[in-house]
A protein has these predicted regions:
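Acidic/hydrophobic-patterned starts of short beta strands in beta-sheet-rich repeat architectures
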Residues: 1-7, 66-76, 147-157
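Beta-propeller blade termini
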Residues: 1, 55-64, 136-145
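Blade-edge motifs of beta-propeller repeat domains
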Residues: 18-54, 89-135, 169-191
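Long, internal scaffold/assembly segments composed of regular secondary structure
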Residues: 126-134, 143, 151-154, 158, ...
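Short loop/turn segments that connect beta-strands within the blades of beta-propeller domains
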Residues: 7-10, 77-78, 136, 158-161
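Calcium-coordinating acidic loop motifs
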Residues: 18-20, 62-69, 88-90, 144-150, ...
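Structural motif
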Residues: 11-16, 80-85, 161-166
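A charged, solvent-exposed segment within the mature domains of Sec-exported extracytoplasmic proteins
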Residues: 5-7, 16, 30-36, 55-60, ...
Length: 191
């Protein structure tokens, strides 16, 4: 198992597990701080930016797109959206202990999460300038709850006692993009 953590400056650090099978001595290789390739804005030259997160939030680190490598979904506090950072090592034919993250979606699921824990489906405020209202405390995880091949999203925020479940309609609409089509603000129902 590898370790994903944050530096003091909130940049992503990755430690690859180099423990010999059967050994009781844990050994990790520090891969240093990570950057993502910012190619989303075609008007700007390609540049690499630090992959950083709020110390109060917990990103989802899993194979979100189903291609066999680890991707990262994180809350964007400035815009109240979730950002998808895709690892493209599989596409480049690289081995398992290398990563190249590219920002693939600046408004994952095409929804907005308000400072009051409200969800606005079909709204992506990325191009709008919003005043910061949220100081952190967000977490998220994804799973394919309906076994249709796309992953639904569950989010939570500090100060709110329940989770919010967002249904992904990508598979039903045969869309290229993940699009949240329904929201359940009392999730799970049995609590």
């Amino acid at each position: 198992m590898d370790i994903f953590t944050l530096s003091e400056s909130s940049n992503l650090l990755i430690y690859i597990n180099r423990t010999t099978p059967g050994s009781s001595n844990l050994k990790f290789q520090d891969l240093g701080p990570w950057y993502y390739r910012n190619q989303y804005d075609s008007t700007q030259p390609i540049q690499y930016n630090p992959l950083s997160f709020s110390k109060f939030d917990m990103p989802e680190i899993s194979d979100i797109d189903g291609d066999g490598d680890l991707d990262i979904l994180s809350y964007d506090q400035g815009n109240y959206t979730y950002r998808l950072f895709k690892d493209v090592r599989i596409e480049k034919g690289w081995n398992r202990d290398t990563f190249e993250f590219q920002i693939m979606d600046i408004c994952f699921g095409y929804f907005n999460e308000g400072f009051d824990n409200s969800i606005a489906l079909g709204e992506c405020p990325y191009k709008d300038k919003l005043k910061p209202r949220h100081t952190g405390g967000a977490s998220c995880f994804m799973y394919d709850s309906d076994a249709d091949g796309d992953k639904e999203l569950v989010i939570s925020n500090i100060g709110f006692p329940r989770f919010t479940y967002l249904k992904n309609g990508k598979a039903q609409s045969k869309s290229y993009y993940d699009t949240m089509v329904a929201v359940d603000t009392i999730f799970p129902q049995n609590t």
